[in-house]
Every structure is written in structure tokens, then in C-alpha cells.
């Protein structure tokens, strides 16, 4: 029979609708609710087989295209590799309800069976992965290294795969056998009261295999402690707080499981001259009031290969004005573009003047015209009106 018909859903059903339909039927035909009922057991296996296919996006796509006997269905098609025994059907059942057992409650079974899942120590979902642990290291870069990119060698402590046994944990290939209790699945299904549950196999600790002749070097773990040098290529444009992920450079997994990842966290030292704002650089440039009045061309520092660039400061520039030098900022870490260099001009008032300098400034002040100081004139006009309002 068609899997969609078995679950009572349309071919356009969403994954959530398929799961909901399966849950309802699986509870209805569960053998613990129908003891000794052969037809209920058959239907339970049937709906479990249908969900095993339709609940998996890849299997469902193959089934929709080719039917039960499609090229990706395995030997004998989907049905031939389906729920031939009750243990497989119960495992599918546990997978569909896994996230709702025990724990902090509120799930489907807690409402249906009064929290029996927690009472029996049920675990949600599949067993945790035995992949090696991920590692993290911090690296400090100079401002220039972050701007240009750099290669670094890091010394990382952790676990590596045991060379003596190639990570298997056994002296020889014959030193490993399939667990007799769980038949290699890593889980055992037990019937407790009203329903059945899957739990980690106690004989193999969920590995699915038992090492009878452990490696003398790693003592059956498949890995050993190690310190190694890791070459890291840090791209230009990184900033503090960013991290680089190096897949497979973490701890080796136990008994041949995949290695974890290495995360390199970046810290960038501050620069004495530049501030960074995204990909833009900000440079505070102090100039004298004469240069501000007359205008000037100045050599200013940059992070580019040339080291400097010439900046034209227009006459009459005011303190706080920002001049933009395009393309002289930080490179974007995700592409080929660069930010800009933003030069914030700070006009400095002279201090500790000599008598001669003071006399020259007084002579200049005597020649001032209103148009020389438009802001000053505007301000005086405003306060003149302000005081006239309070005149008696």
C-alpha cells in the first residue's frame, strides 16, 4: 500500500503533518496498548515503515520519484529494508517521540502517560555524538597584521588518533566484535509497563561494538594525548571577536569517530594613531589655526604599502570637519573591497605665546571683517535679538 495512504496524509503534506499523523497512529496501534493483537502489531510495523521513509527528506524524495523499489531504497526496496521486526519499529517510535520524553516535561508522553518517561529514565532523541571535542584558542594580532593578513603557527594540546591501532582501539581487526546484546545498534529496547523504550546498551556503552583485544598504546580508546603545531592562515580584515573554524583540527574522536573542530578566536591590539570603525579607519589630525585658515597639503599615515598619502586641507576648514580618503581603510574580510580613511581635523589653538606673537595676533584682530567669521557673526546677531527682548 502507498505510504501516504497508510499514514492518511496527502502527498503534499508537510513534515510536521506527517509526523503528527504517524504519532497518532503509532500510539493507537502500539503493542503495549493492544497486547496479543496480531493485526495491531502488523499495523504498528506498517505505519512505522511508512514514517521511516516519509519522515526522511531524502528517502521521501526518492520514494516520490521511484516508488518503493527505487534505486536508493536499498536491497529489496524500502519495504524490504523496512520494519521486519518489532525492535526496528519501536526504535522508529522512540525517534519520533524522542524530544518529548522525560527531561523538563511538557511533552506529548508526559501529557498522555502522566510523565512515565521521566519515571523510567527515558532519554530524549538519539545518543550524543562521540565525535571528538572541539577546541578553542585565542590569538592576538597587531593592528597591521589584522589589516594585511598573516600566517601563524599555534601549539594546540589535545587528543590525536592513535597511530598504533589507526584509531580503532584494538590491537588487530579481530580484536573488535559486534555487541551481542544490541547487535551493533548501540541501543536496547525494553518493555516497561505500558510502553517500550530504547536506552543505551549497557554492554557496549552505545558503541555497538566491544573491544576484546585493546590496543596497548591507547588502551582501547583509539586516541592519545598530544601537542601539535597547527598552521593558521588568517585573512586580511579580521577584527576582535571574530573566529576562524578549522574543521577536523580538534580532538580526535574515540574509537575512530570523527575529530572535532578548532576555533581560533581573534584579538586585535589597538593602534596608537588609527581607530577602526567597521572597515573604515579614523585618523585624528591636529593642525594649527594658520594652516586651517590658509589651507595646506599634508602627508598623512596609511596602512597601505606606501605608508603615506597626501591630503589637501582646504582653507577655512573648521575643527571637527571629516575629510574622506577613499579606499585607504581596512580590507573587507569577506571580499576585495576596502573601507575609507576618515580624517577628522582638529584645529589647535596656540598656547604659551611670546609677546611678539601676541602683538601680531592683535594686529590681525584689528583687521577682522564680519565675513571672516560667519559663525561668530551669526551668533552675535542671535544674542543681540535675545538681549533686545529683555530691554527695559
From Swiss-Prot:
Cofactor(s) this protein cannot do without: Zn(2+)
Gene3D superfamilies: DnaJ domain, Heat shock protein DnaJ, cysteine-rich domain, Urease metallochaperone UreE, N-terminal domain
Pfam family, one: DnaJ_C
Cofactor note: Binds 2 Zn(2+) ions per monomer.
BP GO terms, sorted: chaperone cofactor-dependent protein refolding; DNA replication; protein refolding; response to heat
Residues holding Zn(2+) 2: 179, 182, 201, 204
Binding site for Zn(2+) 1: 162, 165, 215, 218
InterPro entries to which the protein is assigned, alphabetical: DnaJ, DnaJ_C, DnaJ_domain, DnaJ_domain_CS, HSP40/DnaJ_pept-bd, HSP_DnaJ_Cys-rich_dom, HSP_DnaJ_Cys-rich_dom_sf, J_dom_sf
Chloroplast in keyword set: no
Top-rank taxon: Bacteria
Entry's localization field: Cytoplasm
Residue stretches making up the J domain: 2-67
CXXCXGXG motif repeats: 162-169, 179-186, 201-208, 215-222
GO cellular component, one term: cytoplasm
Gene Ontology molecular function: ATP binding; heat shock protein binding; unfolded protein binding; zinc ion binding
SUPFAM superfamilies in the record: Chaperone J-domain, DnaJ/Hsp40 cysteine-rich domain, HSP40/DnaJ peptide-binding domain
Keywords: Chaperone, Cytoplasm, DNA replication, Metal-binding, Repeat, Stress response, Zinc, Zinc-finger
Zn-finger segments (CR-type): 149-227
Known function: Participates actively in the response to hyperosmotic and heat shock by preventing the aggregation of stress-denatured proteins and by disaggregating proteins, also in an autonomous, DnaK-independent fashion. Unfolded proteins bind initially to DnaJ; upon interaction with the DnaJ-bound protein, DnaK hydrolyzes its bound ATP, resulting in the formation of a stable complex. GrpE releases ADP from DnaK; ATP binding to DnaK triggers the release of the substrate protein, thus completing the reaction cycle.
Assembly mode: Homodimer.
Domain notes: The J domain is necessary and sufficient to stimulate DnaK ATPase activity. Zinc center 1 plays an important role in the autonomous, DnaK-independent chaperone activity of DnaJ. Zinc center 2 is essential for interaction with DnaK and for DnaJ activity.
Family: Belongs to the DnaJ family.
Protein's name in the database: Chaperone protein DnaJ
Amino acid at each position: 500500500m502507498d505510504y501516504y495512504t497508510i499514514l492518511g496524509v496527502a502527498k503534499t503534506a508537510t513534515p510536521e503533518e506527517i509526523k503528527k499523523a504517524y504519532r497518532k497512529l503509532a500510539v493507537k496501534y502500539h503493542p503495549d496498548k493492544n497486547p496479543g493483537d496480531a493485526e495491531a502489531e502488523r499495523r504498528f510495523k506498517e505505519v512505522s515503515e511508512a514514517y521511516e521513509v516519509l519522515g526522511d527528506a531524502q528517502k521521501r524524495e526518492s520514494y516520490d520519484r521511484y516508488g518503493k523499489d527505487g534505486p536508493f531504497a536499498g536491497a529489496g526496496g524500502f519495504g524490504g529494508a523496512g520494519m521486519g521486526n518489532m525492535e526496528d519499529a519501536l526504535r522508529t517510535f522512540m525517534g519520533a517521540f524522542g524530544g518529548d520524553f522525560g527531561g523538563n516535561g511538557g511533552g506529548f508522553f508526559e501529557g498522555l502517560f502522566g510523565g512515565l518517561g521521566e519515571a523510567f529514565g527515558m532519554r530524549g532523541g538519539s545518543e550524543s555524538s562521540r565525535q571528538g571535542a572541539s577546541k578553542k584558542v585565542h590569538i592576538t594580532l597587531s593592528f597591521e597584521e589584522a589589516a594585511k593578513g598573516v600566517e601563524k603557527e599555534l601549539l594546540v594540546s589535545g587528543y590525536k588518533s592513535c597511530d598504533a591501532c589507526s584509531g580503532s582501539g584494538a590491537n588487530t581487526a579481530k580484536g573488535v566484535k559486534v555487541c551481542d546484546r544490541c547487535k551493533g545498534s548501540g541501543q536496547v529496547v525494553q518493555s516497561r509497563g505500558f510502553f517500550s523504550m530504547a536506552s543505551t546498551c549497557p554492554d557496549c556503552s552505545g558503541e555497538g561494538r566491544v573491544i576484546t583485544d585493546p590496543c596497548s598504546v591507547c588502551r582501547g580508546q583509539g586516541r592519545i594525548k598530544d601537542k601539535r603545531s597547527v598552521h593558521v592562515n588568517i585573512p586580511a580584515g579580521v577584527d576582535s571577536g571574530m573566529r576562524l573554524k578549522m574543521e577536523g583540527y580538534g580532538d580526535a574522536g574515540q574509537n575512530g569517530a570523527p575529530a572535532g573542530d578548532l576555533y581560533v578566536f581573534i584579538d586585535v591590539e589597538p593602534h596608537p594613531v588609527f581607530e577602526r570603525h567597521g572597515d573604515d579607519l579614523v585618523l585624528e589630525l591636529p593642525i594649527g589655526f594658520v594652516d586651517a585658515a590658509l589651507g595646506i597639503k599634508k602627508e598623512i599615515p596609511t596602512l597601505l604599502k606606501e605608508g603615506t598619502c597626501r591630503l589637501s586641507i582646504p582653507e577655512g576648514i573648521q575643527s571637527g570637519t571629516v575629510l574622506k580618503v577613499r579606499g585607504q581603510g581596512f580590507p573587507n574580510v569577506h571580499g576585495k573591497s576596502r573601507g575609507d580613511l576618515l580624517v577628522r581635523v582638529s584645529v589647535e589653538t596656540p598656547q604659551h605665546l611670546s609677546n611678539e606673537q601676541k602683538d601680531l595676533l592683535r594686529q590681525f584682530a584689528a583687521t577682522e571683517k564680519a565675513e571672516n567669521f560667519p559663525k561668530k557673526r551669526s551668533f552675535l546677531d542671535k544674542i543681540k535679538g535675545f538681549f533686545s527682548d529683555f530691554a527695559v
